[in-house]
Amino acid sequence: MNVLLTNDDGVYAEGIFILASYLVSAGHRVVVSAPDRERSATGHAITISYPLRAYKIKLNIKGEIDVYKIDGTPADCVKLGVEKLAGFKPDIIISGINDGPNLGYDVLYSGTVSAAIEGWMMGYTSIAVSLNSNGQYHFKTGADFIVRLLNNFDFLSLDQKMLLNINIPDLPGEKINGIKITKLGKSLYEDSFEKRFDPMGKPYYWLTGNNVDNNIHDSTDIWAIKNNYISITPLKIDLTDLSQIDILNHNLNNL
């Protein structure tokens, strides 16, 4: 398959390097178009106020692969990669492997997931893949799973393009309990800003906070990861709340 690969951790991150290596070794044609630095939690931002620059670089990966670092966001990397850099029409766009999970409401902040959404909006089946990092960094577990997924699921025959959010436990493959098809859970935080001072005595603020442990149902991505399952969540981007339309029509009749 022709694979466009991106991430939000940056082009030199371990997760994208290992995934690219596995994909090339499995016989896939891969082009990497990724940010030149850390771009986590940038959401679906795109660059419109200044030009983007792309630099072709080398990564120590055996086999044919073109790698570009972009001074833009993950969504920028997908747009530019598809339109100008790849040299082929992608069969699939993959974003990851992210260092850290993207579960529940966090997908709305995630540059990793937003890059996949951008690919889907452009008409391509797209996958975001993240590792629930706990210090072990089993990126190879995630890379092996993605290769097996591409080998066993015929994405090319689908009438509708898919948008998938995949989270992988940070474990050796043999310790994973299986695969769960899930829905998004509710990941909520108690946010706080810590006030600090720079060497000039001027204040700045650092966002901190704690995860609020909600009721976690066994159908959610959060439950699956907590119980050492691979979570696969099909996503859509229509945010319309259909249940509110009649209420609004009724109450705004005389406005």
Curated annotation (Swiss-Prot):
Q: Which InterPro entries match?
A: SurE (IPR030048), SurE-like_Pase/nucleotidase (IPR002828), SurE-like_sf (IPR036523)
Q: What is its main location?
A: cytoplasm
Q: Which domain of life is it from?
A: Bacteria
- Provide the transmembrane region boundaries: none
Q: Which GO terms describe its cellular component?
A: cytoplasm
Cofactor dependency? a divalent metal cation
State where a divalent metal cation binds.
8-9, 40, 98
Which compartment or compartments is the protein found in? Answer: Cytoplasm
Return the Pfam families for the record: SurE
Keyword Nucleotide-binding assigned:
yes
Q: Which reaction does it catalyse?
A: a ribonucleoside 5'-phosphate + H2O = a ribonucleoside + phosphate
Q: What EC numbers are recorded for this enzyme?
A: 3.1.3.5
Q: Name one GO molecular function term.
A: metal ion binding
Q: Which UniProt keywords apply?
A: Cytoplasm, Hydrolase, Metal-binding, Nucleotide-binding
List the NCBIfam families.
Answer: PRK00346.1-4, PRK00346.2-2, surE
Family, according to the entry, reads as follows: Belongs to the SurE nucleotidase family.
Instruction: Spell out the PANTHER family in the cross-references.
Output: 5'-NUCLEOTIDASE SURE, 5'_3'-NUCLEOTIDASE SURE
Described by its record, this protein's role is as follows: Nucleotidase that shows phosphatase activity on nucleoside 5'-monophosphates.
Q: What is this protein called?
A: 5'-nucleotidase SurE
